[in-house]
């Protein structure tokens, strides 16, 4: 069974679209970067599944991020994705967290920010409160607020895998709420074990065996961190050289780490001189 794929499907007898996502390797790469508590691992898995599902709805080339913030023990959890289904993510927390901790106990009073950033065009940002019991319900509230389209989302994660389903009325003329409600009831019956162990085609057959479902070719999902030594060098260049020289004099090197993949980039005195020998904008030596 191939994991790390997103599947789109349509109903020939209803104006409703669906998506199904199954994650394993990409999910493991995200949670391997830090020693995350179990509850945060599962949260990041659900967030990855959600980001993949939402990315598939984009009508443009660009990025999407789902960011959760709050005043609880977890201050931040974010997953970034793009139209190529490349995902990365990170979380910040403080103290011990129970393995069965739920959304509101993790974030306290919090909110979710969904940011859409086209390669060409204006950025869009939507904000909803984390005042529901589950991430799925918060995302459904976001769609109700931003698109006014009936939407159903199911998310699952354990220590090894993550998965999710997305169901939404197509933005067409007419009232298709009755069709959606019927399919939503069927989708609600999906079990975590089914999404973790069965092929997408079998899952859809079990859920919608009396419907006319058209399943499209899968899209591969990968973990992709955009960090590099050059990007770290660019960050150093934004700091006054005197300040960097002071750190080098005291520590002998500058070490920069990536929160997303835990890579480390080390710069010594020679590296620093080379960084500042390049004009910030022109890329030519002075």
From Swiss-Prot:
CDD domains (alphabetical): Hsp33 (cd00498)
Alphabetized GO MF terms: protein folding chaperone; unfolded protein binding
Transmembrane segments: none
Record-linked PANTHER family: 33 KDA CHAPERONIN
GO cellular component annotations of the record: cytoplasm
Name under which the protein is recorded: 33 kDa chaperonin
NCBIfam families on file: PRK00114.1 (NF001033)
Gene Ontology biological-process annotations: protein refolding
Function per UniProt: Redox regulated molecular chaperone. Protects both thermally unfolding and oxidatively damaged proteins from irreversible aggregation. Plays an important role in the bacterial defense system toward oxidative stress.
